[in-house]
Regions:
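Glycine-rich loop/hinge motif
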Residues: 133
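Amphipathic, non-transmembrane alpha-helical stretches in extra-cytosolic proteins
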Residues: 36-43
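A cross-family detector of function-defining hotspots
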Residues: 32, 44-72, 77-118, 125-127, ...
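Cleaved targeting-peptide boundary
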Residues: 24-34
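Sec-dependent N-terminal signal peptides of Gram-positive bacterial secreted proteins and lipoproteins
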Residues: 1-26
Length: 192
C-alpha cells in the first residue's frame, strides 16, 4: 500500500513539474524572441533610425497624405462628431468633455481647435482595434515596415510616422506608431 502511495505521489509530482516547466519554457522562449527581435532591429543597417530624419528645414513638407481609409479606426474617421461616434459604437466606457473612450480606443478633441466635439485624434493602447492595413498594438516593427514601408519620419520620441507633416510645426496628418524598440505599444491617428 505504501509503495502504491509513493508511486502515485511521484507520478503526480512529475506530472505537475512537467506542466510547470513547459509554462516557464514558453515564457522564457517568448522573452528570448523579444530580446532577439530588439537586438536584430538595433543592429540592422537597413532599420530606420531617428538621426536619419533630422536634416529637414523648418516648414519643409515630409511625406504625403494617407488615403482616407487609413485615417479610420473602428470605422470612425477624423472629423466625425462625438454624437456620430456614439451612434456608431454605442455608449463609451468613459466620457469626458474632450474625449470618448471605448476600452483601449480613445477619440479625442482639442477644445482650442473647435467648440464642437469633433474627433481630431484617435489613440489605440491595446488590441481592441487595428489600422485599416491590419497593424495592431503588439505587432512587431518588421510587420509595420512590411505593410507601410520605411517611416516618412521618426520624431524625437522615436515614434514612427506615416503621412503628411511640415517639419517643426503642428501641421501633421497621419499615423504614429509608438514602440518599445521591437513591438508597437500605441497607435495614434492625428490631424493637427
Amino acid at each position: 500500500m505504501r509503495i502504491k502511495f509513493l508511486a502515485l505521489s511521484l507520478g503526480l509530482a512529475i506530472l505537475l513539474a512537467g506542466n510547470m516547466s513547459s509554462v516557464a519554457d514558453a515564457s522564457w522562449l517568448s522573452k528570448a524572441m523579444d530580446r532577439l527581435e530588439t537586438s536584430n532591429a538595433k543592429l540592422s543597417p537597413s532599420w530606420p533610425k531617428a538621426e536619419q530624419y533630422r536634416h529637414y528645414r523648418p516648414g519643409q513638407v515630409i511625406g504625403a497624405y494617407l488615403p482616407a481609409e487609413d485615417m479610420k479606426i473602428a470605422g470612425v474617421s477624423l472629423g466625425t462628431s462625438f454624437d456620430a461616434v456614439k451612434a456608431s459604437l454605442g455608449q463609451p466606457t468613459s466620457e469626458k468633455r474632450d474625449e470618448l473612450t471605448y476600452g483601449g480606443i480613445k477619440f479625442g478633441h482639442s477644445l482650442m481647435q473647435d467648440s464642437r466635439p469633433i474627433v481630431w485624434y484617435i489613440t489605440v493602447s491595446n488590441r481592441d482595434a487595428v489600422t485599416a492595413r491590419g497593424i495592431a498594438v503588439g505587432d512587431n516593427l518588421k510587420k509595420v515596415m512590411d505593410v507601410y514601408g520605411r517611416p516618412d519620419f521618426i520624431d524625437f520620441n522615436n515614434r514612427w510616422f506615416y503621412g503628411y507633416l511640415r517639419y517643426n510645426s503642428d501641421n501633421i496628418r497621419g499615423i504614429f506608431f509608438e514602440h518599445n524598440g521591437s513591438k508597437v505599444t500605441k497607435l495614434i491617428v492625428s490631424d493637427n
